[in-house]
From Swiss-Prot:
Bias type Basic residues, positions: 124-146
Protein name per the record: Uncharacterized gene 2 protein
Low complexity bias (residue ranges): 172-182
Compositional bias segments (type: Polar residues): 101-113
Biased composition regions of type Basic and acidic residues, renumbered to the chain: 69-80, 183-198
Region (Disordered): 48-198
Organism: Gallid herpesvirus 2 (strain Chicken/Md5/ATCC VR-987) (GaHV-2)
Amino acid sequence: MTRGHRTALSPSPRATSLCTLMPCTAHTFAHAYCGACRGRGRLLPGQGSALRTATRPGQDSAPGRPARPRTDPGSPERRPAGTTCAGTGLERPPPRGARSVYSQSPARGSTAPTVVRAGPRVWERRRPRAPRRRGARGLPRGRRSRVALLGARGRAPHLPGAAEADRGELFAAAMAGAGRPRPAGEDPRADGGERTPR
């Protein structure tokens, strides 16, 4: 194999260093990382580059880099002071507004030591909470209005034709708490108020 030539056996750009939070053996394989570094595969300033990430002694871990002397990982000959692993251009910046391991900015005026927290992962973000259904106000608990279950014109929402229901009509009917589906031509605001069975 040519030196510096990326093949299927060489590590992916994300696997060019040990993981920041949990150094794991997944970084030694191609296109694999443990995920604790959120795919960036960066090093903390105290760590040295990983010897294991290059697949074999004659091959560089990324194309276009000069061949380095094979010294021990933490030595200054291999890793100059103040640098981490060489950037590949594919590292993602931390999410906006998040405190991560790499960007530590303490709050103004506080003397407390900085707490290092990783930013929120994309797949762990909370979904926005669904609005409360006000259509089931007068119904017994556990039973929603038929509008919420069937849609504004009496069709189940998964059946064909339900998508053509006017959204404004559906919203007004749900807000009014209608106990029955409205006919197609009826104005949803005709009765002027809430309809709940007594």
